[in-house]
Amino acid sequence: MTSRERVRAAFEHRQPDKVPVDFGGMCCSMINAIVLKDLRAYYGLEYRPPKINDMSTMTAFVEPDLADCLGCDVQQLYNYGDTYGHINTDWKEWKYRGETVLIPSNAVVKDDGKGGYFVYPEGDDTLPPSGHMPANGFYFDNLTRTPEFDEDEANPDDNVEDYTHVTDEQIAYHKKVLAKVSGSQRAIQVGPGYFGLGDANNIPGPNLKNPRGIRSIQEWYMAPLLYPEYVEEVFEKGTEIAIESFRKYWDAFGSDIDILFICGTDFGTQRGPFMSPEVFRDLYMPYYKKMNDWVHAHTTWKTLKHCCGGIFPILPYMIEGGFDGINPVQCSAEGMDPKTLKDTYGKDIVFWGGGVDTQQVLPFGRPEEVRRQVLERLEIFSKDGGYVFNTIHNIQANTPIENIVAMIDAVKEFNGDK
């Protein structure tokens, strides 16, 4: 099988010849920039300063030569813009924890006077910063820049501003990226923009110059109970924008794309869902179903959702809402036992992730512990297809290279490639 055939088989719940593998194939399966640099050195690849895909996570593009070494079966059409409204077309050097990396040329980074850094929406430093990396930190945290929400002046269009209206420039960018990677035979995944129905990463409006509306994460998660009509109008209009964006991408790319990343909104914590299954079913699921139903009726694409945490109680409604795949499969969270997940929902949804614990085992375990957990997870999740191997979310800063290599070698061992 080609990589593309392998991934399609997994999404059709057929047993592929090997377990498909993803590193850098979607926005939440990335690799920290410094770790990526060290991985390239380990495999003897040409030195290139890591090119930052998104400054909030400080993850870097996985280029084709490294993807070959890692055995990747998925190719991401990397985002046109990042969390802070930086455009990923032109680049400049910046020092990140002593290492040279490439960041978008319109990014403006300023010292905070305490060893950390600020970034600004669309690189406009005449405005308050929208992101902050603390001293000795590795990531930029989004900053809330708006006053407390005034319900007397509530206008749902203020939060609808977050949703991505696809532009001709964005489509042209992705066509250029696709032309460079189309010969790889990897499955192609794309996320055309933000359609997240309240993704905490986007609620503060880090890419917007003058965000309005409900911008405090705490206020947002109370809003469904306090201002249900406001939230429903935001979701209704956001869903219409999403479907129009999907239509534009189908017209531009058709079946050259295999997987559509719809949404990165988290609904789980380490200890379980942070809302009741009934709230998810009644408020969120109808809009997700509308998006997924359009995709399945009008395209050949499979759909993918990211959702961290212990989400076992709401997985039935994600399935009913039409998602084909779920990432990152956080098996370290409460209620997310791998075997129970596979036995209960393995025929209904593709598990994309869950391959190794990135909170404890991968960063702090011994290589043999990493190998053992990877082989155990592969044995459980790979049965009858329906699985794409990946770590649980991005590979974090300071993860030992020997542990990452142990993980990759274990996957190759399981697949008969080593």
Regions found by a protein language model. Give the residues of each.
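Residue-level detector of functionally special positions within alpha-helical transmembrane segments
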Residues: 2, 71, 94-98, 266
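Beta-hairpin (beta-strand-turn-beta-strand) motif
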Residues: 72, 79-82, 122-124
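Catalytic domains of carbohydrate-active enzymes, especially glycoside hydrolases
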Residues: 59-76
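Short, surface-exposed beta-strand/loop "edge" segments at domain boundaries and coil↔beta transitions
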Residues: 28-30, 86, 124-131, 197-198
